[in-house]
């Protein structure tokens, strides 16, 4: 996604958030008019008090000659009863793929995210702040606390996607436009799922190689794919899960027999695909993927990390809610709680 496309998406999301906010205000006024005054006030207070959990994923794929890159940014957010950011956690996965003139594909050997790599992602060495990726990403996340989704969506960056605000630059000099967009998307997706005041947002990612072949031929291209499982959680003071959202993305670069690499224009997650994912007809439960995901998330609520580690896809109660393979989603949830 180039800078122009990203800017257009940010403007569209800001407009959508503003329209959503206006729509909610008007809907509340209409409801009050059709009820007694005390009943309408009580309903409005209940809606306002709901704390919301959100997950946003922004995936960009680029190509150049015989090389390509997939960059996936994810944000877990917790919105307070006034709709302002209370807790934010960010992470990013970067996957580089190359090919030679015979169509042979070279894939990464390390599928960890930037946060998971820690000191193995050597940003601090070249940073003017001498800070690593996690420190700078957390500084950006902390800067957003107390903002509304609209304020986040309108955060200004320079032509390289880097912050322009002096206060933010004192703790973060990396490009943040993709993280801003992920947070904005997470806010737009946020729902009341059980989180409450005092909870904290958590985020976990499990990425695995989804590529079956490594050499393209005249008859068959290679889809250099990474399968990414993402789980956003909120936890209480006892580190028990109070809400959860689980999603997956399968971005892929196409490699042809002469080594040329082509990136997709758009990558949607399974939650974003919704009914278009097309799983319902093949599901023993008659459920679409997002409904299986909701069943898995329901099974996480109230549990600690140790209890989640003991979950089994073969458990009868879980199978009644979810029959998809939970292996990588479970690992992502455990990563969020580590």
Indicate where each model-derived feature is located.
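Bacterial signal peptide processing site
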Residues: 23-25
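Bacterial N-terminal signal peptides that target proteins for export
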Residues: 1-11
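Low-complexity, Pro/Thr/Ser/Glu-rich flexible segments characteristic
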Residues: 29-47
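C-terminal motif of bacterial Sec signal peptides marking the signal peptidase cleavage site
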Residues: 18-21
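Intrinsically disordered, low-complexity segments enriched in glycine/proline and serine/threonine
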Residues: 6, 27, 275-278
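Active-site- and interface-proximal helix/loop "cap" or "latch" segments in soluble metabolic
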Residues: 47-338
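Composition-driven recognition of long, C-terminal low-complexity regions enriched in serine/threonine
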Residues: 27-28, 204
């Amino acid at each position: 996604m180039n800078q122009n496309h990203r800017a257009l998406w940010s403007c569209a999301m800001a407009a959508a958030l503003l329209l959503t906010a206006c729509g909610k205000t008007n809907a509340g006024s209409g409801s009050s008019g059709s009820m007694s005054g005390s009943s309408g006030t009580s309903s409005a207070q209940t809606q306002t008090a709901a704390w919301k959990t959100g997950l946003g994923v922004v995936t960009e794929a680029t190509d150049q000659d015989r090389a390509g890159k997939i960059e996936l940014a994810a944000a877990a957010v917790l919105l307070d009863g006034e709709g302002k950011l209370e807790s934010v956690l960010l992470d990013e996965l970067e996957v580089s793929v190359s090919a030679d003139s015979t169509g042979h594909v070279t894939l990464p050997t390390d599928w960890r995210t930037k946060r998971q790599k820690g000191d193995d992602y050597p940003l601090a060495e070249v940073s003017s702040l001498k800070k690593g990726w996690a420190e700078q990403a957390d500084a950006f996340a902390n800067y957003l606390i107390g903002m509304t989704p609209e304020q986040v969506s309108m955060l200004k960056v320079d032509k390289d996607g880097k912050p322009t605000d002096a206060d933010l630059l004192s703790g973060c000099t990396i490009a943040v436009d993709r993280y801003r967009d992920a947070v904005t998307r997470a806010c737009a997706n946020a729902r009341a799922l059980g989180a409450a005041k005092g909870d904290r947002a958590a985020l976990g990612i499990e990425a695995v190689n989804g590529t079956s072949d490594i050499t393209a031929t005249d008859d068959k291209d290679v889809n250099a794919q990474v399968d990414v499982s993402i789980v956003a959680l909120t936890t209480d003071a006892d580190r028990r899960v109070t809400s959860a959202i689980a999603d997956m993305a399968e971005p892929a670069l196409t490699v042809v027999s002469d080594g040329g690499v082509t990136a997709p224009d758009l990558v949607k997650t399974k939650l974003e695909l919704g009914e278009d994912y097309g799983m319902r007809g093949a599901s023993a439960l008659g459920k679409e993927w997002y409904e299986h995901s909701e069943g898995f998330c329901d099974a996480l609520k109230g549990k600690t990390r140790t209890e989640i580690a003991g979950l089994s896809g073969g458990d009868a109660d879980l199978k009644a809610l979810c029959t998809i393979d939970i292996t990588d989603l479970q690992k992502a949830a455990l990563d969020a709680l580590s």
